[in-house]
């Protein structure tokens, strides 16, 4: 048996939409809105109860549960993360090369990982729909039952970038999710967010509650007590402009529920009239027809002083009707703003610390082809990531074509182009980046760039502390030795680090002779006028006119020699006899007995014991015979051998020789010993070097059994005002890198003399003259090169030798070229600074010139297939290689602050540069609530971002009004105040809209209206005020806060105008400057407010809610507001005329129409008086006529009674 289908006798009075799709939370929200609009709240709640029962029933029948297997990871996650890692590695390499600075690297890293996380989150919903549409996680989150997209993304996607407790983005992203598990490092980083959620839940909830209390306090007295205030002012809403600045779902919310302040016309047809409220249908019409601008009423311009009228407020947000009279709209507004902050602090417990933001919009190529555009319309620039690009300031037409199709693209203005003209692009390749239409939250922060090395700071161009243009800063590698004494070695000395001994106080015992007693000599041993006791045989005072120090000769076995300082000499003669003949102090003869392998060094202001082998005993090995003379030389004493036999020592040669095999990098400066002991002296400074240093290589056998390998270094002194604590750097072998220029070398240790006909080459060395050693050694090193000049062919040589020497040499610092027998036709181009090798029967090869002091980056190519393996400065140029002192380049951006000077010794971790840059503020509500509080309190450091270009364009339209108009200043003040109010509303809305929270603008406008309703009285001119003595001029004192409407009314009443300026009061200050002292005292500073109010004799009229609650009276809300509404005593004619006056448009604070209004009022008053007197006369006349009529009436009555009597008499 089938039942008859149900037929609706009375169909719906509207068209019912048919939903045949998955009901997610957005569709449900739309459906519920339609139900509320058509059926009301009661019927809608009944329908929703039925939907709830249906949903639970279906979930129970389907046995929906949630397990760990339901968490499905997106398949594209692997290659997305791999691509992001490769881009991160590329950015790291560019930073090491010095191509980008730290801010650009951090910015690119954040944007790359955020874009990866965002793409992964966007693919999550399509992946669930395609693979498992009935997945419980998918149904739960996308239906709105529990969980948001961000939380599900952390379960099955990736957590992404996290914020630390200070709000700074941690540059190490969390690549895992909760399904796959986190590594130990990722877990520790994610603990930031967990702790952040706990702290925010406990602490920030109290802050949000206090914010709600202050918001309610400032607007608690605002109640709807009137239907229409009669204002003609309003607010212009531009839908097209707002659509660019805010999201589309929030555009219509600025219109729905408002009341029009003027008629709206579309193509000459009026579709809406003044004082008509805007519903969904009318809002859609205005939006799609792009009517602009729309003039609506707002609480900003309501003429009511202590309340708000019904039409300026608009519809009630709970149901689609106009707000009822007696509604406490102030408390509703305060709670509407504060309550989302209280609720949203609880959200961070699950997603705390996750960085959120917007990704840039890219223009991609639709297909593979060749791209063409006008090169004259683009200009080179540098992107925010440090990459080269082009920028177009106007719209740019781009054409992409191939042999099959052609397509034209239009690039918006101020976009970045990443391609060149006539370049071949692939499909989906990013060709341009569109500038964001709305600027997100940004804050200026300082970024400190720290040194990664310990060393010395160099810069390429001279500059002050402020970097004026982008340049490189270099930190040359070196280690720091901190000492409490003045060092033995001076600037530019070369020393052996294991043998460098520094001590402040050294005893000279065991080195005594008869004349020298066992005394300890202090470091500051020879001061002016100080007696040196028991130093010589007889006490002697050194003269006062100079300071004295003592040098000692350094003794070697079987050798007597003294060393003097030379300039720019690599080979030093082992004997010098230069005398300084200023003042000689004769000394008695004495003998130093020095053990084998030991020596004594006496330096400036110090006494050192320089001991190679402290275990050796005192052995009489060599004597120095003859007297010594003490001479003055640069305020110091120098010991010279005076007398005795002088030895002639043969000339000694030294060479910097290096043998490389299979690209071995040798990290030291090699010095070879030839035949005799020698010293390496650098730039006129003292010597601290071992006498025997043989040529030794890593991985090679020693050529001499007596050779030993010691670490060499160069000392750079650090200027310091505090002489007690000096430091200097030691360049250890690890600070140098030797680059071998040839690809494949072989080392042959052959005992074979060179041919006699070989030409000996005298090459100018690094520090002086360098002699050839080819015929000096009994054995030589010969190198066989498989690849010479990196060509696969060997060089043809006419010589019949079995070995080949190096065919080419790099230039030294003097730019000199030497010709060899085995190499021909070497041409040097002084303009291109390149070395050309023109070999017979071969093509040319070009090498870049390297020179001493040149800075090289790691990214450069020193040959066709060899790339430089480290950045640094070239310090040594060999014949077939050069030595680089390792360094780290840092790119200093324009406007950065340099925290160090040229040549400063830096430790690892020292601040090198401080840069100021803008970073995105996190969109988390926890960072947003202080922003709301900052705006609401109108603090001085509040920065309101503006689109200046549009603001100036808007300003140009009003310049004609300002100039030549006496009232232009009043107009500008009014417009500035309105613009400030609108900006405050927009900034507060941005915080909540970023979290998807929808707050009506009228709530925020009520708050802003209260904090901008006071003005500050600036000055009262006593001399020109004629009414000063009768008290009118002293109505307001300078510095007094008065309501704007009150000042305007008093300004009309007084003959002298009141000077005032508009100010922004915060919530707290506005709550403490109200008409009710009971409300102020119950908020803050109770004793101070009550004492001040008692002294001023203030009266509280109990118009607000709070003061009535305190006193236990009826609050003026709902049915209790009628007792405060006073009936108008004006007659109908006067009220109509006053309504006509109120319709006059007023742009200048009603100043320009004041005379007209006063004259109209005076005429009106006189006319009313005349009409009143005329009415009085007519009334008296009417009274006389009435008395006359009464007499006639009484006479008629008497006649009537008389006639009745006659009639009765006739009847009888």
Curated annotation (Swiss-Prot):
It is found in: Plastid, Chloroplast. Residues 1162-1212 are annotated as: Disordered. Its main location: plastid. The keyword Repressor does not apply. Its EC number is 2.7.7.6. Its cofactor is Zn(2+). Pfam families: RNA_pol_Rpb1_4 (PF05000), RNA_pol_Rpb1_5 (PF04998). One of its GO terms (cellular component) is chloroplast. It comes from the Eukaryota. Zn(2+) binds at residues 229, 302, 309, 312. Keywords: Chloroplast, DNA-directed RNA polymerase, Metal-binding, Nucleotidyltransferase, Plastid, Transcription, Transferase, Zinc. GO terms for biological process: DNA-templated transcription. Binds 1 Zn(2+) ion per subunit. GO terms for molecular function: DNA binding; DNA-directed RNA polymerase activity; zinc ion binding. The keyword Iron does not apply. It catalyses: RNA(n) + a ribonucleoside 5'-triphosphate = RNA(n+1) + diphosphate. It is an enzyme of class 2 (transferase). Belongs to the RNA polymerase beta' chain family. RpoC2 subfamily. In plastids the minimal PEP RNA polymerase catalytic core is composed of four subunits: alpha, beta, beta', and beta''. When a (nuclear-encoded) sigma factor is associated with the core the holoenzyme is formed, which can initiate transcription. DNA-dependent RNA polymerase catalyzes the transcription of DNA into RNA using the four ribonucleoside triphosphates as substrates. This is DNA-directed RNA polymerase subunit beta''. It comes from Cryptomeria japonica (Japanese cedar).
